[in-house]
Amino acid sequence: MRLRHLSDPDSLPALDKSFAIERPALGLAPDAPPVRILLLYGSLRARSFSRLAVEEAARLLQFFGAETRIFDPSDLPLPDQVQSDDHPAVKELRALSEWSEGQVWCSPERHGQITSVMKAQIDHLPLEMAGIRPTQGRTLAVMQVSGGSQSFNAVNTLRLLGRWMRMFTIPNQSSIAKAFQEFDAAGRMKPSPYYDRIADVMEELVRFTALVRPHREALTDRYSERKAAGHVIDEATDLSSIAIAPQPLPESETS
């Protein structure tokens, strides 16, 4: 499995738990299993700050009641490099995306844009394959790390890509400036407003994912696709047709 092992998953030294809601989605949706979140990062360096930021996000997500998986892209081929996408890393990435109900994308900003490592992962996720939609209807949180001053070029691009992949990108986002100053020697993020923003984003992602989950099929049901597939609407069973159909007046109002 190409999954990153998350060290110290329950250790949150930068989080003041006296202000943290441990299950922020309670009451927003029917009680259900933990929301499933896939996290992607955009650098293969041994001390990758996008990976370290994603690991902090995963710890917070687990504290907030989510189930997380972090994909390791270290042996992912370039798009179109392998015939018919027949590569175990590609297959595993797609399976993880299908498993997910929400995702976190975190890229370094390099030359004003996301990295090729980040883009390659997204490019390996088709809108549809054999009737399966690996990204459509999922929620998405976007993050970036920068070596210099704070910027938003990468998160803006990730938002654009999320819309292209027909995902529901949440309003909040995280951009960490001078990321090399924000992590200690052990790779843990120091307490800071940047860490607090990641906590905000993950809390919001859990809530939005819980809200969207029961309605994902309805939210991605499209006229053009029904038309192309020849799926004719049966007005006798279609709930929307029943709801807007003229209703007979009660006898007291017709007499």
Curated annotation (Swiss-Prot):
The keyword Oxidoreductase applies. FMN binds at residues 43-50. GO terms for biological process: protein homotetramerization. Gene3D superfamilies: 3.40.50.360. Keywords: Flavoprotein, FMN, NADP, Nucleotide-binding, Oxidoreductase. Its EC number is 1.-.-.-. InterPro entries: Arsenate-R_ArsH, Flavoprotein-like_sf, FMN_Rdtase-like_dom. SUPFAM superfamilies: Flavoproteins. GO terms for molecular function: azobenzene reductase activity; FMN binding; FMN reductase (NADPH) activity; oxidoreductase activity, acting on NAD(P)H, quinone or similar compound as acceptor. Pfam families: FMN_red. It is an enzyme of class 1 (oxidoreductase). The keyword Cell inner membrane does not apply. It comes from the Bacteria. Its cofactor is FMN. Has NADPH-dependent FMN reductase activity and very low azoreductase activity. No activity with NADH. NCBIfam families: resist_ArsH. Belongs to the ArsH family. Homotetramer. This is NADPH-dependent FMN reductase ArsH. It comes from Shigella flexneri. The gene is arsH.
